[in-house]
């Protein structure tokens, strides 16, 4: 088959001419391999670069059930682009998925990421993946694969999108599904590290209205750093707690805040009554509420308001759970109790 005729002065086109730099992709793989290597754990078969990533379920599980989760970082990325700050969003990506699967009692086993951009900036992408690897280390799971998609024209220069995928395992007999939660149980709240990765469309609107100096000091760090603080990963302290006492239910406080996430683990007929005075509203949320004129109800529906994970235990176990989690470095408060639902009310009420 003869190639099509072209104009005498025309030169042959390459993939790079079309906007895809294969060499940059190869350079990125070389840069991130050491980060991924630090996350290796028992069960990983092979390294990065194969068509599929292999993982052997640990033999300690007699009846393993796999638990999967996927998520992104949302419009927090827009703030990362504006600040040219890319070192925290990788941990956000991991946290969003591993905290979700943890809620059902699962130990995170492995993680995969998807990084999409219009033009690949190797240093930026490597910084993001380094954060992903750090998140995997914090949660004890292996970064065993991923995809970097350079797609000219799909994203503006300097912007990218992220997606993450986590898989964990839990013994079938130890799945946490909220079925044992009963009246009188206690709701514990574990402190968040900040806004985490939800509500940033409202955050950005507040910033647009208030026009603050993001480099200004805000309680010992810049306002930018406070806004971009990575999502806290609760895996190790909560897995340890599950070995010591009965955790009846957990809720990762993400989009929808406390009032929409806690009901996801409650049986019909039960309500979690939360006391908003039981824990301090962190200064960053006070700042957002003040500068945005955000009502209390909207704050509780959009933001975590200082509580990143809710844990439900029996009243008899509450003090022991608090002591154990505090010793593990968590800030914990008794934020509410479980009671029978009253006619016409929601499954989580804040009083």
Curated annotation (Swiss-Prot):
Its EC number is 6.3.3.1. Pfam families: AIRS, AIRS_C. One of its GO terms (molecular function) is phosphoribosylamine-glycine ligase activity. Keywords: ATP-binding, Cytoplasm, Ligase, Nucleotide-binding, Purine biosynthesis. It is found in: Cytoplasm. GO terms for cellular component: cytosol. The keyword Cell division does not apply. One of its GO terms (biological process) is adenine biosynthetic process. InterPro entries: PurM-like_C_dom, PurM-like_C_sf, PurM-like_N, PurM-like_N_sf, PurM_cligase. It catalyses: 2-formamido-N(1)-(5-O-phospho-beta-D-ribosyl)acetamidine + ATP = 5-amino-1-(5-phospho-beta-D-ribosyl)imidazole + ADP + phosphate + H(+). CDD domains: PurM. Pathway: Purine metabolism; IMP biosynthesis via de novo pathway; 5-amino-1-(5-phospho-D-ribosyl)imidazole from N(2)-formyl-N(1)-(5-phospho-D-ribosyl)glycinamide: step 2/2. SUPFAM superfamilies: PurM C-terminal domain-like, PurM N-terminal domain-like. The keyword ATP-binding applies. Gene3D superfamilies: PurM-like C-terminal domain, PurM-like, N-terminal domain. HAMAP family: AIRS. Belongs to the AIR synthase family. This is Phosphoribosylformylglycinamidine cyclo-ligase.
């Amino acid at each position: 088959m003869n190639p099509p005729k072209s104009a005498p002065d025309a030169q042959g086109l390459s993939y790079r001419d079309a906007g895809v730099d294969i060499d940059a992709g190869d350079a990125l793989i070389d840069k991130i391999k050491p980060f991924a290597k630090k996350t290796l754990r028992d069960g990983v078969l092979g390294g990065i670069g194969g068509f599929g990533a292999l993982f052997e379920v640990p033999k300690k599980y007699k009846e393993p059930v796999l638990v999967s989760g996927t998520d992104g970082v949302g419009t927090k990325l827009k703030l990362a682009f504006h600040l040219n700050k890319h070192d925290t969003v990788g941990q956000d990506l991991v946290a969003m998925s591993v905290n979700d699967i943890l809620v059902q009692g699962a130990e995170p086993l492995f993680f995969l990421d998807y990084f999409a951009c219009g033009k690949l900036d190797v240093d930026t992408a490597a910084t993001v993946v380094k954060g992903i690897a750090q998140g995997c280390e914090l949660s004890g799971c292996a970064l065993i694969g991923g995809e970097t998609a350079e797609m000219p024209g799909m994203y503006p220069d300097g912007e990218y999108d992220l997606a993450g995928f986590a898989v964990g395992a839990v013994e079938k007999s130890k799945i946490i599904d909220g079925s044992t939660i009963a009246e009188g149980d206690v709701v514990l709240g574990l402190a968040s590290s900040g806004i985490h990765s939800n509500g940033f469309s409202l955050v950005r609107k507040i910033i647009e209205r208030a026009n603050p100096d993001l480099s200004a000091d805000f309680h010992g760090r810049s306002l930018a750093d406070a806004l971009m603080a990575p999502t806290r990963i609760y895996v190790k302290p909560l897995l340890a707690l599950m070995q010591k006492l009965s955790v009846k239910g957990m809720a990762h406080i993400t989009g929808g805040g406390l009032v929409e996430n806690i009901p996801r683990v409650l049986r019909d007929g039960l309500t979690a009554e939360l006391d908003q005075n039981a824990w301090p509203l962190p200064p960053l949320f006070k700042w957002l509420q003040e500068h945005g004129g955000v009502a209390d109800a909207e704050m509780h529906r959009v933001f975590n308001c200082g509580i990143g994970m809710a844990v439900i235990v029996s009243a008899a176990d509450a003090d022991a759970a608090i002591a154990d989690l505090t010793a593990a470095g968590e800030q914990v408060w008794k934020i509410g109790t479980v009671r029978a639902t009253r006619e016409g009310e929601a499954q989580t009420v804040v009083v």
